[in-house]
Each structure stands twice: as structure tokens, then as C-alpha cells.
Swiss-Prot record:
Its main location: membrane. Residues 33-58, 83-102, 294-324, 349-383, 428-479, 669-698 are annotated as: Disordered. Pfam families: TbpB_A (PF17484), TbpB_B_D (PF01298), TbpB_C (PF17483). It is found in: Cell outer membrane; Cell surface. InterPro entries: OMP/PagP_b-brl, TbpB_B_D, TbpB_C-lobe, TbpB_C-lobe_sf, TbpB_N-lobe, TbpB_N-lobe_sf. A lipid is attached at residue 21 (N-palmitoyl cysteine). Residues 46-56, 460-476 have a biased composition (Polar residues). Residues 1-20 form the signal peptide. The keyword Signal applies. Binds only human holo-transferrin (TF), via the TF C-terminus. Forms a large complex with TbpA and TF. Interacts via its C-terminal domain with Slam1. Residues 299-315 have a biased composition (Basic and acidic residues). This is Transferrin-binding protein B. Belongs to the TbpB family.
């Protein structure tokens, strides 16, 4: 490349050398010339990393499916000879009481029962369940079961003609959890035991004699389901040594080191003589763990052995849709569901580690036999735990930090029981979860509003819609308000970590606000503003041992002392910058957060790495942080001296890091000067940050 500055220097240099030789002794001391040019700062770029595959199962607190009731009237037009089950039949449950999926239960409670007064049959109530495993029955975080009402035959008419006839019970099977696990055992095998329930499709003349009495036409006019199951052990006096419990039971083993799950779904048969078969296994489970979720397949184990053989039960087809999750602070319990590939059977289930005795000690063979010695035991005691996810919300007004629920999906924010997708629909339906920006480009941050489906219209809340489910219908309130969430999320180059700003807004119509009907514009009330961060932690075995690893990114911050400063994440030159150097070998992390259009670091962070996370402190410079640079006479400053920082590493190989802190000095800051000059304010800060691992530009 032709550089005029270089050419000019080449012309001048010979003349200069010649004059040096001619005048003053003819010597030229090269040692007096500084030939070392300043070295430019190294240039970096993001490392490439594996993008997460789009998740077929978006997770949730639980799922329910309603019994089918076929129109069996022979002259019906169109005829309804068969109703198959579908993935679209799954409905998400709300958060809260694990035995009460309120939306679904309210639907059935509102039905008029047989003879006008049939009560709700509920497996969670005493003496109404059919399944139980002794020592694994005291569920605290997950419940699975059924509830239904006996409904008399109903007829629909048009004019004087019958158009439809239906009969049989109406209800749901479900599993529902609370407190999705943030930590799980690092290694070892853990045994879970519990129960399962099912319902079937409906088809003309279909019957399953292995399941019980067929006189009311289960499987034909209404779904055969576990609530009417017969020929099973349903009390202790019927239980033999060869039985593994009452009714329908599950046995699941989880290998947390290998991230695998295997299990059996069993029916405990009532036996009349010693030659009878005590148990029948209908399914084997095989799944892979990802954070606090798992997915895989269920294989039918009692299929017809040849084309000529038939089975008198519906469990004859495999399923490729097994999914579920762990609940409880230490992964003590789990719930799952699947639909058979022939769309004939839907299954839900739950299982738990061994119950604790009432005195709180570990049951024999339970926690003490946990993964430390390789034997199957319970995850809740005596086994090392690892953090599998972070999900936190930091409120700006009171500087509080609270945990959010999350289903090991950084791209789904769960607040107030509502699931908010953080990526545009285009990226969710694609091959991976890369953040597709506007106009085909990539937006570093994304801003959008989210109104839960249950608030937009009177829909059946909790029903999965196009893979974008609302976790519950709790967003609206009884006063007709509609809650809208205003979200800004960062960053497009982060796949396993998302952080940003969240604003809750309540809207109500002018009529609801007491205005005249001519002022029909919605009135919006800002309820509260906060920051959030959530990420899928790196497996501790995959944490590298490298030294001087550079991470770069951005941050959101709100800093106050009388007056305040706020800054948002940005990839613009001179925007909010986050720079970190990580020494995995010595387990140290050092970094700076620099505010928009500032040269000096706003915060200096130092910390120690433990496992797949880190903790440390953040502080401003001794001279403080200028809150308002436009104030030339008296710049208000904030002094942060010892903010406690928490964070983690995210992605398959720790390609991403992030963290957070909220600081509120409850005493007057010694060196602080507030905007009013009275010296009575205290400094505070709320910060979330994220960064991507870097490599030198080649």
C-alpha cells in the first residue's frame, strides 16, 4: 500500500544522514535514536461456540391433559369414530400448590356431575389415590395424579334433532412442581421412586380388558385412564413381597456424572395365587439431563411379539417425547410426561428420593447411601452439589436480590409465574437459538413488550401455543388490570447467558379508571423496575485450566447518591464496557466495568473462582464516580467500597461469564456529596454484567 508519510521519510533521511556526516566530526550515534515504536493494544474477537439447539420441551411447572369424550351418536354429522391424542392437548399448569392445578381443576369443578351432584374425585385426597410407594410418598415439590367427575350422558340438540351424545367421566391427569432445582448432585447414582398415571385415546369399539371393567366403555366413548384402573394392589393387605408398591409405580435411577436417567413404569397386579404375575413393566425410560431438565424416550416393554398377537392394554408403542424436570433445592424430586408415538396413550409421573424420618434424620439406606459410594441413594444429603443455573432479579428501588425460577433455558424468563420468551419467534423456530435481530441483521440488545396470553383474551390459560407457552394465568388481577412486561435483553453474542432490564406495568381502560368513555385510551401504571440475569452454568468438569483468559462484554447499571446515573448495555464504541481477565489455574478473576463515554473504570472487580462460579467484591475508585458530568460546579459522586459480587461461567466450555451485585450503604457515606449538598445521602448501586471469551484476531 502506498503510504505518503513513509515515502516522505525515505526522501528526507538520506539528506539528514549526509548533513550529519559533513558537519561536526562525521559521526552519527544510532544509540541515541529510539527505534521502539509503541505497541498497539492487542485486538480480540469472540470465540466461536456451539449454539444451543432449539428445545422441543420449553419446560414449565407442570403439564396436564384432559380426558377425551367422543360423540358416539350414530347419526352424528360428521361422525366422530375416533379421537387421537396430540401434543397440542398438553396444557401447562400454574405455579403454586402442587396438588392443585387451579385452571384445570376449576374447569372440572364447574361441570354438573352425574345426577346433578357428583363430587370431584381427586387422587391427592386421602383414600382416593390408587398408587403409592412406601418410603417415597411424602412429596414436597412435585405431585402427579388425576381428578375427575362422573358425568351423566349428555345430548346436544338442534331444533328437535339430536346432534351429539357423550358419556363418561371428565377430568385431567397431570404433574405439577414448584421450586425448580438450581443445584443437583455432582456425581453418583441416585434412586427415585414414585407413581405414574395415564389416559388413552377414544375409538369405536375399543376396549382394554387388562385395565378393568369395560361395561361403561372406557377407551370407546371416553378415555380409559388410571382413575378407573382395576386388578391392582390398592391396599397393604393385598401387597406381597414381590410387589414394589400400590397401583402404578415408577423406579428411576439418575447418574448425575454421566447425565443420564433410566427407569421403569410398573403395574402392581392383584394376585390370587402364587403362580400369578406380581408385576408388569409397561415402559422403560431413557433420557439425558440438561441442567434441571431431561428429555429422551420411553420404550414400550410389553408389545405384541408378532403381527398376530394383540394386547388387551394400550401400552404398545414407544414414545420419543419423554421430558421432565427436577424440583426442590437439591433435586430431591422429579416430574415427567410423554405421549406415545401412536398417539394412543399420554403418561404423567413423579418420583422422589427416600422420605426422611419425622425427626429429620436420614432414612436407612437413603442419604447415607448416597452417591459418595456409588450406590443409589438420595440426592438431598451428604453428596456434593453443583449449581446448574443462575436466575436472579435485582430491584432498583430497594436493592434486593431474589431468585427467579428457571427451567435451564436462558432464553426463557420466568417472572410472577409467567414465562416470557427472550428471543424473537424467528429464532425460536429455527435450528438453534441464535438471536436473530431486525431486518435480517443481529441486534446486540432487544427491546419488546410482553402481555401474557391469559391477559390478552379470555383463553384457556396455560395451554402451550406454538411452542411459546404461558406458565400460568396469574398476570391479570380481579380488578380488570392487564399486566405488561417491558423487557430489554442483552446480548446477541451470548447463547447461554441473558441479562437486562425488566419493567412491570399495569394497564386498565379509561372506563376502569373512572374516566369518561370518550377517553378510552389505556392508563398505564409503572409498578416496578428491576434488572435480571440468568444463565446455564458450565459443567464443572468442563471448566478450563487456562491462564490470562480475556472476556469482554457490557453491563447495565444504576448508581445513586442523592441524584443517580443509569447506563444500559451496548456494543457501541465507548458504550458501557466490561473487561475481565480470568486465571482458571489460580482460580482468580479480575475485571473492570466502565461507564458510557468514560475513560476511567467505574468499578473494579476482584474475585475467586469456585467450581463453575465466582464471588468477589466491586468498588469505585477512591475519588468516587461522577454521577453527573454536566454539573461543572459541584459534581455529585457515589462511593462504593465493598459490593458483594456473585457470578458464574456459562456454556459448554465456559465461553461466557456473567454476574451481579446490589449495594446499599445504610450509613452516610463518609466522602459522599449528594445533589442537595446536605451530606445526608448514601451511595447505592445495582449492576448486572455479561461477557464473552475472546481470542486474538489473526
Amino acid at each position: 500500500m502506498n503510504n505518503p508519510l513513509v515515502n516522505q521519510a525515505a526522501m528526507v533521511l538520506p539528506v539528514f544522514l549526509l548533513s550529519a556526516c559533513l558537519g561536526g566530526g562525521g559521526s552519527f550515534d544510532l544509540d541515541s535514536v529510539d527505534t521502539e515504536a509503541p505497541r498497539p493494544a492487542p485486538k480480540y474477537q469472540d470465540v466461536s461456540s456451539e449454539k444451543p439447539q432449539a428445545q422441543k420441551d420449553q419446560g414449565g411447572y407442570g403439564f396436564a391433559m384432559r380426558l377425551k369424550r367422543r360423540n358416539w351418536y350414530r347419526q352424528a354429522n360428521p361422525k366422530e369414530d375416533e379421537i387421537k391424542l396430540s401434543e397440542n392437548d398438553w396444557e401447562q399448569t400454574d405455579n403454586g400448590d402442587i396438588k392443585n392445578p387451579s385452571k384445570q381443576k376449576n374447569i372440572i369443578n364447574a361441570l354438573t356431575g352425574n345426577n346433578g351432584g357428583a363430587s370431584l374425585q381427586d387422587s391427592s385426597q386421602e383414600n382416593q389415590g390408587i398408587s403409592k410407594v412406601t418410603g417415597h410418598h411424602n412429596f414436597q415439590y412435585v405431585w402427579s395424579g388425576f381428578f375427575y367427575k362422573q358425568i351423566g350422558s349428555t345430548f346436544e340438540r338442534k331444533d328437535s334433532s339430536i346432534t351429539a351424545a357423550r358419556s363418561g367421566p371428565d377430568g385431567y391427569i397431570f404433574y405439577k412442581g414448584k421450586d425448580p432445582s438450581r443445584k443437583l448432585p455432582v456425581s453418583g447414582e441416585v434412586m427415585y421412586k414414585g407413581t405414574w398415571d395415564f389416559l388413552t385415546d377414544v375409538k369405536t369399539s375399543q376396549k382394554f380388558t387388562d385395565l378393568g371393567n369395560t361395561s361403561t366403555r372406557p377407551g370407546d366413548r371416553y378415555s380409559a385412564f388410571s382413575g378407573e384402573l382395576d386388578y391392582i394392589v390398592n391396599k397393604d393387605s393385598d401387597k406381597k413381597d414381590e410387589h414394589v408398591g400400590w397401583g402404578l409405580t415408577t423406579e428411576i435411577t439418575v447418574d448425575f456424572e454421566k447425565k443420564t436417567l433410566s427407569g421403569k413404569l410398573i403395574k402392581n397386579n392383584r394376585v390370587n395365587n402364587d403362580n400369578d404375575k406380581h408385576t408388569t413393566q409397561y415402559y422403560s425410560l431413557d433420557a439425558t439431563l440438561r441442567g434441571n431438565r431431561f428429555s429422551g424416550k420411553a420404550e414400550a416393554t410389553d408389545k405384541p411379539k408378532n403381527d398376530g398377537e394383540t394386547k388387551e392394554h394400550p401400552f404398545v408403542s414407544d414414545s420419543s417425547s419423554l421430558s421432565g424436570g427436577f424440583f426442590g433445592p437439591k433435586g430431591e424430586e422429579l416430574g415427567f410426561r410423554f405421549l406415545s408415538d401412536d398417539q394412543k396413550v399420554a403418561v404423567v409421573g413423579s418420583a422422589k428420593t427416600q422420605d426422611k424420618p419425622r425427626n429429620g434424620a436420614v432414612a436407612s439406606g437413603g442419604a447415607g447411601a448416597a452417591a459418595s459410594n456409588g450406590a443409589a441413594g438420595t440426592s438431598s444429603e451428604n453428596s456434593k452439589l453443583t449449581t446448574v443455573l443462575d436466575a436472579v432479579e435485582l430491584t432498583l428501588n430497594d436493592k434486593k436480590i431474589k431468585n427467579l425460577d428457571n427451567f435451564s433455558n436462558a432464553a426463557q424468563l420466568v417472572v410472577d409465574g409467567i414465562m416470557i420468551p427472550l428471543l424473537p419467534e424467528a429464532s425460536e423456530s429455527g435450528k438453534n437459538q441464535a438471536n436473530q435481530g431486525t431486518n435480517g441483521g443481529t441486534a446486540f440488545t432487544r427491546k419488546f413488550n410482553h402481555t401474557p396470553k391469559s391477559d390478552e383474551k379470555d383463553t384457556q390459560a396455560g395451554t402451550a401455543e406454538n411452542g411459546n407457552p404461558a406458565a400460568s394465568n396469574t398476570a391479570g388481577d380481579a380488578n380488570g388490570k392487564t399486566k405488561t412486561y417491558e423487557v430489554e435483553v442483552c446480548c446477541s453474542n451470548l447463547n447461554y447467558l441473558k441479562y437486562g432490564m425488566l419493567t412491570r406495568k399495569n394497564s386498565k381502560s379509561a372506563m376502569q379508571a373512572g374516566e369518561s368513555s370518550s377517553q378510552a385510551d389505556a392508563k398505564t401504571e409503572q409498578v416496578g423496575q428491576s434488572m435480571f440475569l440468568q444463565g446455564e452454568r458450565t459443567d464443572e468438569k468442563e471448566i478450563p485450566n487456562d491462564q490470562n483468559v480475556v472476556y469482554r462484554g457490557s453491563w447495565y447499571g444504576h448508581i445513586a447518591n442523592g441524584t443517580s446515573w443509569s447506563g444500559n448495555a451496548s456494543d457501541k464504541e465507548g458504550g458501557n464496557r466490561a473487561d475481565f481477565t480470568v486465571n482458571f489455574g489460580t482460580k482468580k478473576i479480575n475485571g473492570t466495568l466502565t461507564a458510557d463515554n468514560r475513560q476511567a473504570a467505574t468499578f473494579t472487580i476482584v474475585g475467586d473462582i469456585e467450581g463453575n462460579g465466582f464471588s468477589g467484591t466491586a468498588k469505585t475508585a477512591d475519588s468516587g464516580f461522577d454521577l453527573d458530568q454536566s454539573n461543572n460546579t459541584r459534581t455529585p459522586k457515589a462511593y462504593i467500597t465493598n459490593a458483594k459480587v456473585q457470578g458464574g461461567f456459562y456454556g459448554p466450555k465456559a465461553e461466557e461469564l456473567g454476574g451481579w451485585f446490589a449495594y446499599s450503604d445504610d450509613k452516610q457515606t463518609k466522602n459522599a456529596t449528594d445533589a442537595s449538598g446536605n451530606g445526608n445521602s448514601a451511595s447505592s448501586a445495582t449492576v448486572v454484567f455479561g461477557a464473552k471469551r475472546q481470542k486474538p484476531v489473526q
